[in-house]
């Protein structure tokens, strides 16, 4: 697989027209993420109510893979519980880092399938950090709350 194959239609669509792009007013949780290898920088904004993610958005700049992953992530996580978000992240992370398919609850299968276009980054280790930056940032936001944590994928 060459790098051009990574830029599938869905990746390009989300990179060119990211969904849920922009800051949320009064987020309950936020975090900043930075991938110094590629230059990706983003901030994730979340509203979590009663352990459920009611809204999630992001803003920042990054490569096509980073932007597409963040865009897909915002769509997938909205309406999920924090535990479900953790499960989707764990499955996605395993898939892009080791190629392992992690079983998820049946109600999360669609979420992990929607991330499949990004799994080709596994053969390009530097690009794995691009694909997972938004997910690590959401994890930091959930754990750090409204104070805003900064993470780096070095």
Please annotate each region the language model reported.
Residues 17, 21-60:
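Structured beta-strand/loop patches that form or line metal/cofactor-binding pockets in enzymes
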Residues 38, 65, 123-127:
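Secondary-structure capping and boundary motifs in well-ordered enzyme cores
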Residues 60-67:
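Short, thiol/selenol-centered motifs that function as redox-active sites or metal-ligating centers
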Residues 1-22, 80-154:
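C-terminal binding/interaction regions
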Residues 42, 71, 129:
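Active-site phosphate/pyrophosphate-handling residues
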Residues 67-68, 87:
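Alpha-helical macromolecular-interaction surfaces
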Residues 69-81:
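Alpha-helical support elements that line or immediately flank enzyme active sites
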